[in-house]
Amino acid sequence: MNRERLAALLGRERDSFAARHPRSRAAYRAGGANLLGNVPMTWMNKAAGRFPVYLAEARGATVVDLDGHRYVDLCLGDTAAMAGHSPQPVVAAVRRRYAEAGGATAMLPTEDAAWVGAELARRFGVPLWSFSLTATDANRWAIRLARLVTGRPRILVFNWCYHGTVDETFITLDADGATSRQGNVGAPVDPAVTTRVVEFNDLEALDRELAHGDVACVLMEPALTNIGIVLPAPGYLEGVRALTRRHGTLLVNDETHTLSAGPGGCTLAWGLEPDLVPVGKAIAGGIAAGAYGVSAEVAERVAARRDADLIDTGGVGGTLAGNALSVAAMRATLEHVLTDEAFEHMIGLATRYTDGVRGVLDACGVPWSVVQLGARAEYRFTSPAPCNGGQSAAAADDQLDDYLHVYLHNRGILLTPFHNMALMCP
């Protein structure tokens, strides 16, 4: 690759981006007075154009920025808006709860909660559910319950995994073994103390680490999604389940991103049998909400621990978790938006996208790969497609990423800013 030419092309696109977005640039500069990093949340600084565009409005798969530019949104809030922006059934449910009935958060249950629990149980095959405000918290609380019932201190994750900002998951593999992930901010402890880590698709490594007998749970996405999409090899997930059972370790399937595989995520689509299932982001149509499901066996083991404080300050739960507004939005999303029929349509769109990208790559003789997981698809700068997180991370190219992102941005297309994922909504 001609890096000098790539740098020149990137500079040209960035100049064009800056010229096209004077109001967003002014808003970004104004934010520096009182916002850390100029933005409401520091991740928003991941912008190939050197500053983010500012949102004016969004509906469905269309975003309009402060300067009036319209975009086809294939980022969809990095999955949080997988139901599309402001779907009408969710808008109506939120209006009823907040404006008509009132009581957005009264720390009291509503009848919607039982409906949502039953629907999640139907989709994921895990019978008992509890709610959070984020998928990160759903993962945290699932880990706490796993430690409670197993009496074991550690968890196991996969190299270059993503499970929100759960402290224990900021661990990777290098030539010397497990190490804290580069850039890990203010880590409370060395994650090697709390966590074991292996490569995805490596059953021998998993068996070896679980044999230590100190792992409460394996926390995993059934397919990696945040280091590019890495699919499981044939028989791999069945092997993971067999090994966790053999070693007395619980299996936690984080379906927050892999919900794109279908109405019940990979758990339903692939017939998986996890012990706990955290999920979040998309399940409330863009309103903050998360949930975690537990098997009947885990629930019985939790109930048997009379010393565990699940009512007050035992470390599981939160004041806003399960609030009436979020639960109403979850019900509307699951009942009317992210339906079986909607997923069929979304997956069809993703297949069309995947076939189109692959066709362009083949026609141009570009040695990249494109991988689909239900309603999401992603290209990587290598072929064949990576089979684990380490391989996928090694294929990353920040300069090329920036160029493609700002190029597409200037032509009205948004991809997720952290990699090259395209997600479809109903």
Give the role of each language-model region.
Residues 1-426:
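Conserved N-terminal phosphate-binding loop of PLP-dependent enzymes in the Aspartate aminotransferase
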